[in-house]
C-alpha cells in the first residue's frame, strides 16, 4: 500500500465551469500561479495559458477540451479540471462532472447568468455536484453584484449564500469584504505573500451588516444548529458558521457566493480557501454505486485505500509524443505502474503501463495512485470513455457516461490514397477522444460523413484532422441530421419468397406500428400467438426491422419513437431461415411506415443573442426570417438578451450574419433543444432531395 502525502479528507476534485468568456481559464491560470504550479501568469489574449494548450485553443482564445492539473493549497491536494464554456463542447463538461466531487461556477459580473451558465448548472445538478460561485470581472464597467445574485436565484433556482460583497465596482473596485468577520481583501499579491487587507470603509458598513444578517437568516433556514442560535439571539463563532456553511453546501441546500476579478488578481486566494473549506473531499460524497458484472446485483465502493481498486475512464487523448492516454478517476483502492487491471465493461484484462499525473499538457510520471486521485495511463489499449477499471478478484461495473446524439454532419473526402489511410487513422483517434463525434461511411455515395454537436465542433475537429494528422481533404458544407417518425397506427405484412432450384427462401411476418412520445425511442413487442413463428426467426425479423429503421424508410434518415408489434406470420420447415425472415421484417416495416403517415423531424436549437439595444430590431428581424420563435426579450444595462428557438437548418452562417447586422458588437450561444416536426412543404423538399441522390 502507498504512503499518502495528503489524507483523503484533504483531497479536492473540482471543476471550473461556466459560460464562454466568463473567465474560467483566467481563474484557473491564477490558481496555478498562486499554488506555485506555474511561475508566471498565462494570458489568453497572448496564447500563453497553460490550460489552453491545443493550437486551436490558442488561435480561437477558447477552451475546447477539459484539462486536468494538480495543485496544492493550505495542506490540501487539489485536482482541478478547466472545462469549455462553448456549448458545442458540452461533452467535456458532462464527462468532467461525472468524475468530480465539487464545482466552482464562474459568472461574468457584467453579463450575469448566460445561456451556457444554465446548461452547465443543469449538468452539475443532474450529478448532484456541490458548488460555490465566483462572480468575476467586478472591475469591468457595468458589473453588478446584486443583479447577478438575483439572476442566479431566478434563472438557476438556486439559494444564494453570499459570503462576500464587493467594495467598489468597475474602475473603483478595491476588493471584497468577507461577511463572516468583515475583513476586506484587495490584491492577492505573490504566492508567498498574504493577500492585501484593508479596513471596511464606513460607507459600506451598513450594507455589509445587512448582507451578513441576510446570510445568517438563510443559513438558519437550512441548518438546525444555526437556527437554534438565531432564535436564542446568540452569535455563533466564525468556525461554527463555517462548519454550518460546509454542511449546507455539501447537501446542495445553498450555494456560497464569492466575488473578485481574476485578471486583476483580486479574490482568487479567498476562492482557494473556500474550495478547501466548503467543497467536498472524496469521503464526503456518497459511495459510488455499481453492479456485479455477472449477476447485475447492486454494489458500491467507498472512498478508501483499503477497498478493492475501482476507477472510471472518462477521457481518451491521442498524445503526439507518447501515444494513447487514458484519464481515469480512482474511486477506491490504489493502483501501481506496471500492474494488471480488469476492464469489467469489456470483460478484458489490461495492463497499466506508465502512470502519469497530468499538468495540462505536461506529464509527471508517478509509481502509484490512490483513491480519490485523477490520473492518466499509457498502455490501456482497449479502454474507452465510460469504461470501468477494477480489481479482477473483486469486479464491479460502474455506471457509464451518457452523451447526447450529434445533430449536424458533413462529408469529407481525402484527395489521395495516402490521405485516405491518414484520414481513417485520424478520424478513429478523434472519435475515441470525443464520444459526440461519430464517423460513418456512406456506401451509396462512397463518402465519409462525420457527425458533431455544432458548426464550431466540426470546424475544430476538421482543423485537427488536417493539422495534427497531416490529411489533405475536401470538406463539404454542414448538413442537418434529420429524423423520421410516424403519426398513425398501421398494419402490414412482409413476405419474402424466393425459389431458384433446390432449397428456397421463405419468411413471413405481420407487424403493427404506432407512434411513441417524442424521445421514447424504439420498442419491439412479440405478440405472435401459438408459435406461428419460431423465436429465432422472429428475432431475425426484428433485426431486419431495426436495421431498416436505422437507415430510414421515408427520406433516408433514422426513424425514431416507434413501437413495432409482431402479431402474426408463418414459416416453412425447409425453406425458412434467419436471412429470409430478416428480409421479411425489412419489407414489413417499409410497408407499415408508408401507411402510418410518416413525417420528418428537424433539430431545434435554443439560441441566446446579446446585442446592444440599438440593434435589437435588426437582430429580431433576422431571427424571424430564420423561422425563429422568440421566447423572451430581456433588457439589461447597455444590452438586450434575446432568447428563442430556431431550426438548425436555418442557423448555418448565423455567426457572419449577426456580426454583419450588429457591426460585430453582438454575441450569441446556441445549444440543441429538441427534435420537432418539420413544416410539410419544407419536409417535402428534403424528401425529394433525398430521392434524387
Swiss-Prot record:
Family annotation (PROSITE patterns): G_TR_2 (PS51722)
Gene Ontology MF annotations: GTP binding; GTPase activity; translation elongation factor activity
Localization (cell): Cytoplasm
UniProt GO BP: ribosome disassembly
Gene3D superfamilies named among the record's database cross-references: 3.30.230.10, 3.30.70.240, Elongation Factor G (Translational Gtpase), domain 3, P-loop containing nucleotide triphosphate hydrolases, Translation factors
Residue ranges that the Swiss-Prot or TrEMBL entry lists as coiled coil: none
Family under the similarity heading: Belongs to the TRAFAC class translation factor GTPase superfamily. Classic translation factor GTPase family. EF-G/EF-2 subfamily.
Residues that bind GTP: 18-25, 82-86, 136-139
InterPro entries: EF-G-like_DII, EFG_II, EFG_III, EFG_III/V, EFG_IV, EFG_V, EFG_V-like, P-loop_NTPase
Protein name: Elongation factor G
Pfam families: EF-G_D2, EFG_C, EFG_III, EFG_IV, GTP_EFTU
Residues annotated as domain tr-type G: 9-283
Protein's job: Catalyzes the GTP-dependent ribosomal translocation step during translation elongation. During this step, the ribosome changes from the pre-translocational (PRE) to the post-translocational (POST) state as the newly formed A-site-bound peptidyl-tRNA and P-site-bound deacylated tRNA move to the P and E sites, respectively. Catalyzes the coordinated movement of the two tRNA molecules, the mRNA and conformational changes in the ribosome.
Alphabetic keyword roster: Cytoplasm, Elongation factor, GTP-binding, Nucleotide-binding, Protein biosynthesis
Superkingdom of origin organism: Bacteria
Listed GO CC annotations: cytoplasm
